[in-house]
């Protein structure tokens, strides 16, 4: 693709010191994602998928190589600038929704906008529109404990997308759901990725979900290979 990548990493490596030993988790890893592209990463437990996501999201620093998000090298930014870039250009969805329990669905979705200094009326308007889009217009004032598992994950997806980021990273987004609910969440993610032209990077054990992506990569022995 000639279009500028929304996310890229070059020669990415990560190792940890365990006593006198250095344990290499990732080695010379290469990856590019372009606007609107959907990529799945699969691999056994302990293969380094969570480590990779933390590096790609700027939550950890590599031992070697670098990560570029929306043209900015993450390790070259201050912690404050990294946080602002993440809030603007990146959304996260986890297996467990990580919604704030004391806030309503609407308030949870407003959070990234308010962090980015969006005025409260505009934040509420945009969050309401997105919650309606994911089928939760009737649940705006409900707190997470009052929502089903599938509804909570829809709120989490709306929160990840409310700033219209170029990329959303999803870590086992259907792993905590029954098969019927998981299928509905899959369909929603694919529709939103297409209509909003948002790149999705999905880490999953669910090969049915992985096959819905444009590419599937396996993380094994610290490297990514197409499958």
Curated annotation (Swiss-Prot):
The complex is composed of two ATP-binding proteins (LolD) and two transmembrane proteins (LolC and LolE). Its EC number is 7.6.2.-. CDD domains: ABC_MJ0796_LolCDE_FtsE. The gene is lolD. Pfam families: ABC_tran. It is an enzyme of class 7 (translocase). One of its GO terms (molecular function) is transmembrane transporter activity. One of its GO terms (biological process) is protein localization to outer membrane. Part of the ABC transporter complex LolCDE involved in the translocation of mature outer membrane-directed lipoproteins, from the inner membrane to the periplasmic chaperone, LolA. Responsible for the formation of the LolA-lipoprotein complex in an ATP-dependent manner. One of its GO terms (cellular component) is plasma membrane. Keywords: ATP-binding, Cell inner membrane, Cell membrane, Membrane, Nucleotide-binding, Translocase, Transport. ATP binds at residues 43-50. This is Lipoprotein-releasing system ATP-binding protein LolD. It is a peripheral membrane protein. Belongs to the ABC transporter superfamily. Lipoprotein translocase (TC 3.A.1.125) family. Disulfide bonds: none annotated. It comes from Pseudomonas fluorescens (strain Pf0-1). The keyword tRNA-binding does not apply. Residues 7-227 form the ABC transporter domain. It is found in: Cell inner membrane. Its main location: membrane.
């Amino acid at each position: 693709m000639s279009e500028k990548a929304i996310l890229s990493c070059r020669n990415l490596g990560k190792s940890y010191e365990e006593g006198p030993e250095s344990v290499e988790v990732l080695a010379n890893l290469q990856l590019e994602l372009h606007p609107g592209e959907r990529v799945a990463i699969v691999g056994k437990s302990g293969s380094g998928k969570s480590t990779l996501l933390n590096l790609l999201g700027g939550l950890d620093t590599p031992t070697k190589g670098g990560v570029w998000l929306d043209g900015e090298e993450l390790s070259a930014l201050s912690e404050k600038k990294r946080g602002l870039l993440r809030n603007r250009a990146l959304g996260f969805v986890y297996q467990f929704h990580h919604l704030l329990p004391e806030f309503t669905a609407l308030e949870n979705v407003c959070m990234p906008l308010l962090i980015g200094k969006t005025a409260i009326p505009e934040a509420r308007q945009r969050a309401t529109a997105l919650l309606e889009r994911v089928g939760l217009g009737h649940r705006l004032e409900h707190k997470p404990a009052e929502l089903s598992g599938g509804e909570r994950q829809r709120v989490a997806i709306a929160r990840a997308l409310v700033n219209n980021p170029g990329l959303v990273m999803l870590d086992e987004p259907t792993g905590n759901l029954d098969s019927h609910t998981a299928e509905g969440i899959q369909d929603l993610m694919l529709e939103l990725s297409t209509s909003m032209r948002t790149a999705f990077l999905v880490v999953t054990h669910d090969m049915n979900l992985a096959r819905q992506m444009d590419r599937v990569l396996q993380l094994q022995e610290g490297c990514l290979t197409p499958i």
